[in-house]
Structure formats: structure tokens, C-alpha cells
Amino acid sequence: MSLCKNYAAGVMLAMLTASSITVKAQTKPVPQLGKNTIQEVIAAMTLQEKCMLVVGSGKAPRPAMKAGVSSGYVAPPPMIGKTERKVPGAAGNTTAIPRLGIPSLVLSDGPAGVRIDPHRKGDSTHTYFATAFPVGTLLASTWDPSVVEQVGRAFGNEVKEYGIDILLAPGVNIHRNPLNGRNFEYYSEDPLVAGKMAAALINGVQSNGVGTSIKHFDANNQETNRNSVNAIISQRALRELYLKNFRIAITEAQPWTVMSSYNKLNGTYTAERHDLITTVLRDEWKFKGFVMTDWGGGYSAVAEERAGNDLIMPGRPDQIEDLMSAVQHDSLSMKVLDENVAHILNIILKSPSFQKYAYSDKPDLKAHAIVSRKAATEGMILLKNEDHALPISKNIKSIAAFGNASYFTIAGGTGSGDVNKAYVISVAKGLANAGYTLDANLETSYTTFINDTTQKLRAIARAAHHWPGPVPEMIATDETINQKADNSDMALITIGRNAGEGSDRNLETNYTLTPSEQQQIKKIADSFHAKGKKVVIVLNIGGVIDMNGWKDNADGILLAWQPGEEAGNAIADILTGKVDPSGKLATTFPVKYEDVPSAKNFPGLPAGNPDHVIYQEGIYVGYRYYDTYKIKPMYEFGYGLSYTNFSINNLKLSSPVFNGLLTATVTVKNTGEVAGKEVVQVYISAPTKTIDKPAQELKAFGKTRLLQPGESQVLTFKINAADLASFHTDASSWITDSGNYVLKAGASSRDIRQTANFSVSKTIVVEKDHNVLKPEVAIDEYKGK
């Protein structure tokens, strides 16, 4: 249907929905939400009111780049209403119907902090900044759901105190490929880690009486042509990887809403797939909330409503007309529309807006900054530490900090994942706060260069009508480097990389360090090492990068990710030894990009403007691929060093024969000299007599409390039949095969410390699922070795 169809009438509808719907006074009282049953309220609604409720309003989606064009944008279609009335900068809202006691819900981005306008018209005395919490890759690297839940509780308080009902987070999509521009928002290459971390965040946020929207359902694993690309995936890969993460989070935390994704899945837009949204999500997983589109997602409003995609965001006037016409002409049943309305009303009943919560606009940002800083330290990963380069020696007093990101440290990614925060503590500032002397001339040089270059790039972008490009790294002269080696006690280099919504990362300039960057690292290392001084590199990045050609130049490497607004303070906490590093990788760093199993199938075909992407690697994503095909990674899944050492011993199983539930215990002991925490990862190798399987899969994990030197803790893990099951496509069932299994407990996927054998005597059919979501074409999938 043309966007211009009956547009004049659409404008009239839009005006009606700008704040509410009004109907002529009636002679008898009408039902009221909360006082009457939802069925009675729905029965009192007009068709127009129902259609307006399921078509929301708010910000237009971000302008989309024209395919194959380097500049210029496709203008977004006209949207209904504005969001400025209640919470300026919020992403959108639902339509209020005052005569029936139905308020408007306010929806806001984003995954690392509330994303609203920090300044408001007519209010010069108050600001509305939000806390920038660590990004998803860092939170997953804590391997500690309790830490993530604590972040969620603080996060949810800001959601509530700023007058928001539903947070459009978390994002839980799998790290299929390291070039995905939004991997920073997501958690892991492994569905167990991703699902558990998302559940923790949801539980924390929703403990405040506000809602979340888990996204992007499903298989939104790239930004290139995300609005139209067709993800072609086998049923098994969907069930075991790309749906399992959502299932874990939804069943363990019951988010109020689910957001469907932009892309097509096996030929159909996800927002229009009844088998995905109703059969799998509602019938199989028992989801009770409502489903909304991503902003401007999908194609047909009628098809979306038929599929069970309850709320269309942010709606257009013509969509309301389409829905009304569809009901009147029997192409959309009133029963389906009523069910979708009921799903939305059930959530409205729980909302702060319905309960008339008197939000303060004054959350405790100082307290939340403390939460953010602590969480950031828990998820930073020590990748390299030669000759005790870290923690920084007590005889170090002065530091030469190189790298743009030492002074303009990246708190988080861009797009809807960005946060309007009051400040970001830079790496240099954090070290200064810790008592170190930073080279003032270097700071002046970097600050001047970055400010001047930023202004130039913005001017160029405005003239060409495109987004500004990233500021290139300032390259210090040989003379400057040698001078700093003479005058400073150590060198610190911060490597910064950013990405975000709307585009994927560039292999040559974002994933890989540029030749000039690599050359500068070598020059700094050579100069400082010649003076007997250490060189430490901090990685201020949102996703995996190529470390070939330069990592050997560093004595120590700290993967700090994008740690939120307290970045520099948290980094200093780790570098100084105030906090022992305990983070572990939740995604693999390959030796080279070509080793990535999806490298030749990302972002799809035809090259340059893909309309489809084949998930040929099937279930062999991340460590499942590297371990099965015996490919050595740069840093394996689960890897992370500490300033102390731990032993993992005394693995015991409750029984050598599986009888429905297996309990495993291990003893972790701090055998080093400083207090620290260890993560124990439980992998299982399963028999492959019926179908191929990965060499091993993560089935459980746990993190110790802070153990003092010599202190021990017993960790307990429970494994059930569902944990052992694989999805058998022919039977459309989850089946635990009979045979011999090996349970492995270790500090990473390649650092296994203890093993134990057990057997399953009879094949167990754990669950029979619907035979849905079939790919339209045959896929020549990887089959393991």
C-alpha cells in the first residue's frame, strides 16, 4: 500500500493520536481498565481505538543509507505523534484512550543506559543525564549473573524515575561474526552465556516494576541491509543457537515485551512469522507479554498483526487505515486483533504510567556510577602479563599515555545503544585519580588534535549529508616517543574502536589496526624497552579485533571493552591491582579473520548489496567451530588471566549413570598471593552416533566469591536431560542420546583441569517441538569432524 494513500485522512488520525483518543460523551459509564475485566474493556473499544492501540507513535527510525551510495539518505516515512510530551528523547509511546482509563506507555532505548534528552526546553536549572553502564560484551565477560542483575536494578531505577515504562533492552543476539557493528550490545557467541546474562539484566530492571524488551527476535546478526536481508538458517542451528539464547532469558525472566527484528528469516520478515512469534514464542515457550516491531520494521501491518506481532512501532497513519479495512473485509479477524490488544493491555496494567507513579526525574546517579564502576572491573580481561608487567609496579610514578582513547575514552557504542551521560572518565584521568603523573604535553597534543579533527570531519559530513567518519589516530613523532621514553617510567597505549547501529565494521580499518597504528606501537615499544621500561596496552573496544603483528610488542594487555562512564577509574582499579582481574572471554579472538567460520558468508550475497546470507556454518559458531575443527585461536573462549593463581580439583559426580539429574562439584583454591575470583566452566562432550555434534559445549558455569590466598570454595553444578539434548531435525525433537559422555571442568575452553565420565543408558526424548521455521533452500552445512 502506498504511504500516500488517503494521507489527508491519515493526518487527521495522527492528530487524534498525538495525545489521546476522545469519543463523544456516552449516557452510561463505560468500562475502565483496572476496574473492569480486560475483556469488558476490549468489548467497549471501537475498531478505530483497537487499531490505534496496536499502532504506536514516536521517533522515526534512523535514516537508512541508500544501497551502493556513499552519501545521502532515504527519508523515513511520516510517523504518528511525538514523544516530547512526557519524556523528551524517549523512543516512542503507545496511544492513550482516556475514556477507558488506558494511559500511554513510554518506551526508551537503550542497552547500556536510559537514552533520553539530557536537556529540555524551558528548563535551564535541571539536567536529565543517565548513567552509562558497561556494554553487553563486558557484562558477559563477568560470567557473574549477580553482577549483571545488580546493574539491572540500578538501570531499572533510572527507567522508573525518568517516567519510562519499558526499556528497549537487552539485545541478546549471538556473536556470529566479529564484524557485526552491534556486537558490543550483545553478550556472547554462546547461547547459554547470552541467555543467562540477559535474564539477569531483565530480572534486575524489572524488579523496579518497569518492563524490558528483549531483542532482536530473531537472527539479527548483522547491520548490513538489516531491514531486508534474508537470513537462511537450518532448523537445528536456529533451535540450538539463535533461539536458545532467547528461550533461556524469556523462561527465566519473563520480559514484559519482545522486539521482533528487521530481517527476514528463511524468506519471511520475522515480524510477519506466525510460526516464530506465536507458535514458538507463545505456544512453546509460554511467553505472556506483548511483541513489538523494531522501529519501522516489517512490511505489512496486517501480516504483522496476523502473526501475533501486537504493537507496530512507531506507527504510520496508513497502517491504522489498513488494519481497519482488513477487519472490515475479513482479511484480519477481530478475534486476532482482540488478542493482540489484550496482550498490550495486560502489560499496561503493570506499568508505572497506569499506577500513576510520581517519578522524580532525579535518580541517584552517584550511587549508580559506583555500580557501573564495580561491574566494569568484574568484566575486564587480562589477556597478557609478561614478567609481572601488571599490576603497575610501586616504583612507577609517571606514565606516558599514547592513543586517542587514552584521553577520549569510549564509554559505549553508537546509535540506539548510546547514552546521554554527564561525563566519561578517560584512561588518563583515571590514572591521575589513582595518583600517577601523566605527561601534560601529550595530553595537550592529543586533545588539540582530536578537537580540531572532529570539527573538520563534522563540516565535511554536513556538506556531504552523511555521518561524520571516525577521528584517525594521532601519530606521535619519533622525537616525541623517544623523549617520553626518557622522561616517563612506563608507556600506556590505549587502542580505541567503536561501532554501532546501521553499519557493520570495516575489516581493514576497524577490525584490523591500520599500518600506521601498528608501526607506532612498535616504535613506542622499541623506545621504552631500550630504556628497560614496560609497555602496557589497553583495548577500549566493543568487539573482537585482529591482534596479529603488534601484540608481541606489549608486556601487558588489558581488554577493558567499553566500560561505561567510569571507564578510566575502573581501568585504573585493574592496572593498579586495587581489583584483581577476573573477567573471561565470552567470545573467541581468532588468529586471523579468515578463521572465523562465517567469514565467507558475511554479510551475504550479492557482494556489496546483499539480499540474503546463508548460515553455512550451522551450529559450528565460535568455540564450537574452533574446538571441533582443531583451529587454534588467538585467545580462546573463556580465557582470562589473573594476578593470582587457582587450582580446580576434586571433581565429583553424583552418579556415573545419568538418572534425570546429574550434580557435579569442584573445589577451587586460591594458590597465589593476592585475593581474587575464578570462573569455572563446565563443558560436555556427547556421543555422535546419531547426529554430528561439537567437540564440546558449555553446559554450566560459576564464579567464586573473592577468595583470599589459600582459601577454597566448592562450586556445584546441576545438569538435566535438556542440558544434554541436541535438536534432531528429522524428529523435530530435543533428544539426549544414549552413550558415554565426558564432563570437563576448566578455566577456559582450552584449559580443562578435571574430567569425569558418565553414561546415559537409554535415549531420552526431552521435548517434541513444532516442525516450523524451515529454510526454503537446502544448506550445505558444516558437519563437524
What are these regions (language model features)?
Residues 1-30:
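Bacterial Sec-dependent N-terminal signal peptides
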Residues 751-766:
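Short beta-strand elements
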Residues 25-726, 735-745, 749, 773-785:
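Glycoside hydrolase catalytic-domain context in secreted enzymes
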Residues 762-777:
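Low-complexity, Pro/Ser/Thr- and charge-rich linker/hinge segments at domain boundaries
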Residues 732:
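Extracellular/periplasmic metallocenter environments
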